[in-house]
């Protein structure tokens, strides 16, 4: 069995470092119907008080963002366009930074259940976006505030990417200089990346 990530993983690292290091890890959701899982292939870092694209910009503290001010490994779920998005808090209490999980590569043994959750969607469309992966994994707003260390959602060490690319984040226009921050991190060549071009898909993406 692969090593389950503990809170030690989050210690002495920046949010940017964590957003890169989490690529290739297995994201697991244990449900009553079975274990659903996939390898993380795309993330975005959100840098809190100084990041205009972050919900917690200027330390904005609301009912929705309250969990962002808690401890590393806490789960921040929010809704956008009727989709639910999954984030992990990264910094010590009071520093509201987070990682958005944008795409995963579904694992073969979990695909059938994940396809059912997605209404029969198959192939790359299954999990190649932040709202798609949460639906496939059966995650919901009820998971808001859970931790990765003592709940039915956790991370495991799994694979190491050959190459990681950094680009601008998706869907954050009109956010000043934050629009152009290279804070989207991807496993180069993964077919499951959001808006991935066929010409950029590689056959061998893991070490």
Swiss-Prot record:
**Alphabetical list of InterPro entries matching this protein:** Formyl_transferase-like_C_sf, MPG, MPG_sf
User: Is this entry keyworded NAD?
Assistant: no
* Keyword entries, A-Z: DNA damage, DNA repair, Hydrolase
**What's its EC?**
3.2.2.-
| Record GO terms (molecular function) | alkylbase DNA N-glycosylase activity; DNA binding
Source domain of life is Bacteria
Residues making up the signal peptide according to the UniProt record: none
Question: Do you know which SUPFAM superfamilies this protein is assigned to?
Answer: FMT C-terminal domain-like
UniProt xrefs under Gene3D superfamilies = Methylpurine-DNA glycosylase (MPG)
Q: Set out the biological process GO terms recorded for this chain's protein.
A: base-excision repair
Under the heading PANTHER family, the entry gives: DNA-3-METHYLADENINE GLYCOSYLASE
Q: Which family does it belong to?
A: Belongs to the DNA glycosylase MPG family.
Question: What protein name does the entry list?
Answer: Putative 3-methyladenine DNA glycosylase
Q: Which organism is it from?
A: Listeria monocytogenes serotype 4a (strain HCC23)
